[in-house]
Swiss-Prot record:
Native organism taxonomy: Bacteria, Pseudomonadati, Pseudomonadota, Alphaproteobacteria, Rickettsiales
GO molecular function: tRNA (guanine(37)-N1)-methyltransferase activity
SUPFAM superfamilies: alpha/beta knot
Gene Ontology CC: cytosol
Residues binding S-adenosyl-L-methionine, per UniProt: G115, V135, G136, D137, Y138, I139, L140
Record's subcellular location: Cytoplasm
Record-linked NCBIfam families: PRK00026.1, trmD
PANTHER family: TRNA (GUANINE-N(1)-)-METHYLTRANSFERASE (PTHR46417:SF1)
Broad class of enzyme this protein falls into: transferase
Signal peptide stretch: none
Protein name as it appears in the record: tRNA (guanine-N(1)-)-methyltransferase
EC number: 2.1.1.228
Subunit structure: Homodimer.
């Protein structure tokens, strides 16, 4: 049995596993560290045309995904994954962060409802206590790409996915990590000099105390310049 299982409701089932079938996530999938199933919302569509959307009450642009169609598909998903927490990628949602990812993993059974068109009927959110989740202040064509993004983040937090689990402690946004929730420092590898640009000498010194101080100073400077709001808790 896998550590994490995701049920994905979408009108484009062929989009999964997508990028999650490659690299670390793909290897973890093959090892059954995580698993998924996809439900095609259109299978629950109405009439011979499998309609899943309709015009909005009160007017407005765009079509809305129908609650009766979504309800049938969600009921099917809950029958397969009865204790799952349900998420709906939406620009109205709580912004997804590294700490939010860890919070989500308290429940290892997740359902992702991928919206399309103008969105979904509000009554679906109320009926199933769906949690809205945002990957940023911009608009995408549907919930599939945010779902892939969120799952990629969750998967790499699972035990056995990263070759060295300590890697997590030296990454950006890790509140208990090396940079205390700030941005990661600048990174360098061979060659020592490239196109006239040299690796900072402190990194070649072998003095671990000075190297650690440099990394923390770099992290603080970069965070202050690019994401100053992260410093309020540092």
């Amino acid at each position: 049995m896998s550590i994490l299982h995701a049920t994905i409701l979408t009108v484009f089932p062929e989009m999964f596993p997508g990028t999650l079938g490659h690299s670390l996530a793909g290897q973890a999938l093959n090892k059954n560290i995580w698993s998924y199933d996809v439900i095609n919302i259109r299978d629950f569509g109405l009439t011979k045309h499998k309609n899943i959307d309709d015009e909005a009450y009160g007017g407005g642009n765009g079509l809305i995904m129908r609650p009766d169609v979504l309800g049938s598909s969600i009921d099917h998903a809950l029958a397969l994954n009865p204790n799952a927490e349900m998420y709906y990628p939406s620009p109205r949602g709580r912004v997804f962060t590294q700490s939010f990812a860890k919070e989500m993993l308290k429940n290892k059974n997740l359902i992702f409802l991928c919206g399309r068109y103008e969105g979904i009927d509000e009554r679906v959110i109320e009926e199933y206590n769906v949690k809205e989740i945002s990957v940023g202040d911009y608009i995408l064509s549907g919930g599939e790409i945010p779902t892939l993004t969120i799952l990629d983040c969750l998967i790499r937090l699972l035990p056995g996915v990263l070759m060295n689990q300590n890697t997590l402690s030296s990454e950006s946004f890790e509140e208990d990590g090396e940079f205390k929730g700030g941005l990661e420092c600048s990174l360098y590898t061979r060659p020592e000099i490239w196109r006239g640009r040299a690796v900072p000498s402190v990194l070649l010194s072998g003095n671990h105390r000075l190297i650690n101080e440099w990394k923390k100073e770099q992290s603080h400077m970069i965070t202050k310049l690019r994401r100053p709001e992260l410093l309020k808790d540092l």
